[in-house]
Structure formats: C-alpha cells, structure tokens
Amino acid sequence: MGYLFTSESVSEGHPDKVADQISDAVLDKLLAYDPSSKVACETLVTTGQVVLAGEVKTGAYVDLQLIAREVIQKIGYTKGEYMFESNSCGVLSAIHEQSADINRGVEREDPMNQGAGDQGMMFGYATNETENYMPLSLDLAHRILLVLADIRREGKEMTYLRPDAKSQVTIEYDDNGTPVRIDTIVVSTQHDEFILPADNSAAAQLKADEEMLAVIRKDVIEVLMPRVIASINHPKVLALFNDHIIYHVNPTGKFVIGGPHGDTGLTGRKIIVDTYGGKGAHGGGAFSGKDPSKVDRSAAYAARHIAKNLVAAGVADEMLVQVSYAIGVARPINIYVNTYGRSNVKMSDGEIARKIDELFDLRPKAIEDRLKLRYPIYSETAAYGHMGREPQMVTKHFQSRYEGDRTMEVELFTWEKLDYVDKVKAAFGL
C-alpha cells in the first residue's frame, strides 16, 4: 500500500519571507562593499513597522532603512490599504557589533583554519524523482507560487491578487517511493475586496465573500494551474496531473487581510520551505541574514551540493548527508549518510560517508571558496527555496551614497552545480 506526502511553500509576500528578504538584502549590500563582513541580521515585520536587529562586523556603511524599503517595494507592498507599505512603514534598527568572544573562535592567522561560527548539525538531501533532484511535492508547491507571482506582476489576469500567498501539494507514492499521482493542491492567496456587499447586512457581506471566492477558485483552476502545467517539461511529472485532484482554494473563504498586517513576520521561520519540504532532515538553523562563516548556512549548502552530486552520479537514488561542527573548530565532527536502502554501490552508508570526507573539504573557509559564498548572492535565495534552483551568472549593481556605486558579476546557487559528478563516478567506480 502506498502513502501520501505533503510539502508547502509560501510566496515572497508572506510576512516571514518579507523578513528573510530584508535580512538577505542587508547581507548582500554589506558583502558587496566588504566581502569579509560578518553578519547576523534578523528582521521583524508587522503592521506598518520593520525592526532590524542582530550583530555585524564590517568596514562598510549601508543605509538600512533604504534597503528595507526597496525590498518591500519590489515585493509589491505599495498601497496604503495593505497597512504595510514601502514608503510609509517605520524602520527601526538595533543592529550592533559582533561579539568579540564569537569572533576570536572564527578568525585565524591561516584562513583555512577558520573555525565554525557555531556548533550544530546541517543536512543536505537529494532525490532523483525530479530533474532538479528535489522532492516533487515541494518543487510543485514552489512552482505554483512562482507562476502566481508572475500573474500578479503582469496585471492582466487575476488583477485582484495581493502579494501574500501559500501553497501546499500532496503526492501519492507507491511502496517503492515512486510518485503515482497528485492527490491534493491547496492555494491560499491574498486578494483585494473586489466585490462589495449590496448593503451593510451580514447576509450581503457573506454573499459578496462567496462570489469573490467563486471567482478566485475558478481562476486558480482555469488560469493559474494551466500555466503551472505548461511550465513543466518532464513527461512523468505531467502524467501525475489528473481530473480527480482535490483543490482547496482560500479555504477560510476570504483572504483580504494579509502580509505583515495579518501576521507578524520573522527571519528564519520558514526553514522547511527553504530546504526540502519535510523530506530528509533539518538541523534547525535558519539561513537568511547570515554570512557564510555561519555553518548553519554554508554547511547546509555544502551538504546539498554533496548529496545532489552523488545522486546525479548514480551512487544512490536518494541520499541524506549530515555534517556537524563545534564552534571555533574548522573540521567537522562527523559526516553521516543515509541512502534509505536505495544505494546503487556495494558500500555501506558509513563507507560512502568516508568517501565523501576524502572528496570534499568541509572546513568553513574551504566551503566558502568552493561555492563562492563571499559574494552578494543571497537575496535570490530568500524566497521560493534555497535548494533546487538554477545556477547562473548575473550582473548586480549596488548604489550607496556612502560607499559609491559598484557593479559585479556573481554566480548564484553554486551549490546546485553538478560539477563533482565525474570525480564522484571515478571515486566510486561508476
């Protein structure tokens, strides 16, 4: 007998993601002007208010208020009726200098001996059920919201859309872990109050709400989902769509009040959306707002890079990689591998872990260098997942009245590159 598995995603306008994007925009601006910056930037967003807090060690000076407002405007919070608007919201900063006690454990005369910025365990996961080696349920949940955001920005259809949205996808698997069909799709999207009640009675309000919901449900099924399906190239994934999918669209009946006005948002509260949608495991450390000396972020990217390259090389059909660190110590305490009984090599998971230790240098500075993490590459990670994205070169422009203008070429999502497949095949005799 098979089973059902569910993953969710949230849009760039979700309050927690607004916070993540502001934190990573601050990080990027600091790295653009001082690549050695040590940053831990936390953001809180609520009705008409942004609060920045955290610890920073940098030689750069940036306009935090301007950074926050630019992010909020780009997301789409540009109307006063949202009760959170880029030009009028307050921006408070309580950012201060990084602890000297932490810094002494990280800085070393030889940079390669740089210690981990904290203790903890980090996980990387990969599966061959999708072309990007991600869990299908999460991949589809992200895709739904990416297309929904495109529709909102185009402004031609579903013109009532507001920035906040969530999706959830449930997949049925057979006993062998192979996707069989899509069972349920949930889409909750914030919207304008585009149908007004005939009068002030509760009955008239209910009637207007029901009419709005009927329009939104019809548009999700007839406008959004066909565009989602059209964006998929893989025949096996397309075959999972069927006429019996259960759709839950705005199940509360109404979603006008949303974004940071509806719910307070905090950096680092969507760590499962950021990673593998509940598949694999998570060590608990969030990513956004942290420079790569924080192994919560850099080692999680490295573990994904390892798992993806090993699965792509054919070592296993599915793989979980754990690494752990002690603060101030460069080399990881352990490397753990779980192939879920789906290994394709005549080696134990422990032997695979030892091979990984030989192939990949997991000291923090080595990870930074290998994955090019000391560059302003993080804003793009802060919505729609840090994993499963497309590696690409982009040109970025930074402006500062304090530091001048800067233009640079950077490589995004380097941990998604399949650049170790040949080395892995050679090491494992594949």
Swiss-Prot record:
Cofactor note: Binds 2 divalent ions per subunit.
GO cellular component, one term: cytoplasm
EC number(s) stated in the UniProt entry for this protein: 2.5.1.6
InterPro entries: ADOMET_SYNTHASE_CS, S-AdoMet_synt_C, S-AdoMet_synt_central, S-AdoMet_synt_N, S-AdoMet_synthetase, S-AdoMet_synthetase_sfam
Positions of Mg(2+) binding: D16
Enzyme class: transferase
Gene Ontology BP, a term: one-carbon metabolic process
Keyword Nucleotide-binding attached: yes
Cofactor: Mg(2+); K(+)
Keyword ATP-binding listed: yes
Subcellular location, record wording: Cytoplasm
Binding site for L-methionine: E55, Q98, D263, K294
GO terms assigned for molecular function: ATP binding; magnesium ion binding; methionine adenosyltransferase activity
Catalytic reaction(s) noted: L-methionine + ATP + H2O = S-adenosyl-L-methionine + phosphate + diphosphate
Pathway where it operates: Amino-acid biosynthesis; S-adenosyl-L-methionine biosynthesis; S-adenosyl-L-methionine from L-methionine: step 1/1
Binding positions for K(+) per the UniProt entry: E42
Record keywords: ATP-binding, Cytoplasm, Magnesium, Metal-binding, Nucleotide-binding, One-carbon metabolism, Potassium, Transferase
Region Flexible loop, annotated ranges: 98-108
Residues the entry annotates as binding ATP: H14, D164, A165, K166, K254, F255, D263, R269, K270, A286, K290
Assembly notes: Homotetramer; dimer of dimers.
Family: Belongs to the AdoMet synthase family.
Function: Catalyzes the formation of S-adenosylmethionine (AdoMet) from methionine and ATP. The overall synthetic reaction is composed of two sequential steps, AdoMet formation and the subsequent tripolyphosphate hydrolysis which occurs prior to release of AdoMet from the enzyme.
Cited HAMAP family: S_AdoMet_synth1
The protein's name: S-adenosylmethionine synthase
Organism of this sequence: Bacteroides fragilis (strain ATCC 25285 / DSM 2151 / CCUG 4856 / JCM 11019 / LMG 10263 / NCTC 9343 / Onslow / VPI 2553 / EN-2)
